[in-house]
Structures are given as structure tokens and as C-alpha cells.
Amino acid sequence: MKIILLYGGRSAEHDVSLLSAFSVVNAVYYNYYQVQLVMITRDGQWLKGSLLTEAPTSKEVLNLTDSAYQGTPIQPGEIKEEDAIVFPLLHGPNGEDGTIQGFLETIGMPYVGAGVLTSACGMDKIMTKYILQAAGIPQVPYVPVLKNYWKENPKKVFEQCEGSLLYPMFIKPANMGSSVGITKAENREELQNALQEAYRYDTRAIVEQGIEAREIEVAVLGNEDVRTTMPGEIVKDVAFYDYNSKYLDNKIEMQIPAQIPEETQAKAQEFAKKAYTMLGGSGLSRCDFFLTNKNELFLNELNTIPALQAEFCRYP
């Protein structure tokens, strides 16, 4: 059977996608599967690369814009093949948000992972919080802020945020991943700058209460029969980890299993399974939690296409 690995993409997480793709092609059991490389460039061009029958030794093989491994331009619809399945490894907007899933369903091509609605809701931090809060899964206090509302009445936004939350606050674009566009604010001036930064990536932002907490992650796998892994913990040398500390500076590592009480471990797995089920998850996802020193768990987010890079795989 052929796996069509779809990676790259137009989002700010293009490079993360290539790292994930390299991990996947090195994990495939080639006695049973072949891997067809299809890369979406930063400007949206689709390139068809090699058909892999064994694991590549170099990451450069996946960069289909490299002259040594130049891919052949194709139309998106040409990805459709019989006896094949697409594995989308497109992180962030235009990949993890339901757009590519909708396209694949339109052309009748089976794919790995969450469907359109789950992908769209899971990518949108505001929608995720609304749905999972209604399901009884604890969240840190937050305030959603739309760009138009901010432009029309910034003073009211400040009052709303400062009336509901305490500094420090974390400001995030609603539809980005890999900590892109996330800023910590200690005062009103920093809050203003942080919102402006978030609006570079999205017209909707979310302001969250900053808390002192450990960061716990649970991998989820399955469709109707849902399984969870033992929780892992992100151990970091920075106050909070942004894109650089995640992927460039090697300032974090994953400790598996997390050194937490059995009761907390079971609760994290229960919440992860419930979040996955309530959002209609399928294939795989990763649930991220905050854990306070009082052993309180708060859901941070659910990732429907988690990064799988070998150097620091956050899919425990």
C-alpha cells in the first residue's frame, strides 16, 4: 500500500512540518508500505517527489525545492490515487485547520487523522475552550479579543482583560501552533504590544491568565477505541517556550513518564480521552495540560496534527 506523505505548507510552521515528515519516513515499515513524497511550498505550489521504498538517510531528500531533489509541479487534484492513503503532516493554518481535510474529502481521498470539523475546532483555541469548557474540562481563565473590537475600543479591551485576569497574561493568535505569535505581558503596555503581535497572524486572539505550572502532555490514539499514553512532562530552561526554544535552541526536553502522582496521571489521561472524544478526534492527537503545585490540571490545547520531529518529539 502507498502512503502519500503531504507536508510543508504555507503556514509559519513549514519547517516544523519537514522535521515531522523526516521522522515519519524513518518510522515506516517498508516491507508493507511505500511512501510518495508530496510537498506544498511556502507559496502554495504542490511538488511531487520520490517514491520511497526505504528510509532516507538525509533530511534534504524531503526538500523538494532543493535542486538536487527537485519535485515535479502537480495540480492538487493529482494527489488522488487508488490503493493509497494521504498522511497530512501540515501544521498550522491551511493544513491543521480542516482546509486540507475538506479538500481530500471532496476528491474522495482517504486520509489519516481528524476530520474537517474536529480539525477546525481543534485548531481554533477559542472554539476549543468553549467546547471543552462545556464538557467540564478545566481551563485557565481567558478573554477572547477580536481584532475589530480591539481597534474600535482598546480601552474597553484593557478593562475587560484586567477586570477578569491578573498579570502576567499570555496572548496568543487563535489559529496558530508551535507557539508562533505568543507573547507574555506583565503590564498594559506589553498587553497592547502582544495583541498587535498576535494580530499579525490572525484576526482573533485569546488572552489567558498566566499561572505557575508544569506542562504535561498526553498522546491520544485511535478512532472508536481510544487509547492514551502515560503523560510526559516538558522540562525547560526558559520562562516559557516559544518557537525558538521549541525547535532551534534545544532548551527543552521531554521526560516520560512525568513524575506526578498516580491520581493526577489518571486524571490527565481521563481529560485527554474526554477532550479527544468530545471534539470527535480520530487517528491521533496530543493534549497539553498545565499542572499547578496543588495538582490542579487545566487543559491548554488539543493538537490534531502534533509535531513528530525526532529531535524533540512531543507525542509521548
Swiss-Prot record:
Binds 2 magnesium or manganese ions per subunit. Mg(2+) 1 binds at D288, E301. HAMAP family: Dala_Dala_lig (MF_00047). The lineage of its organism: Bacteria, Bacillati, Bacillota, Bacilli, Lactobacillales. Cell wall formation. This is D-alanine--D-alanine ligase. GO terms for biological process: cell wall organization; peptidoglycan biosynthetic process; regulation of cell shape. It catalyses: 2 D-alanine + ATP = D-alanyl-D-alanine + ADP + phosphate + H(+). One of its GO terms (cellular component) is cytosol. NCBIfam families: D_ala_D_alaTIGR, PRK01966.1-4.
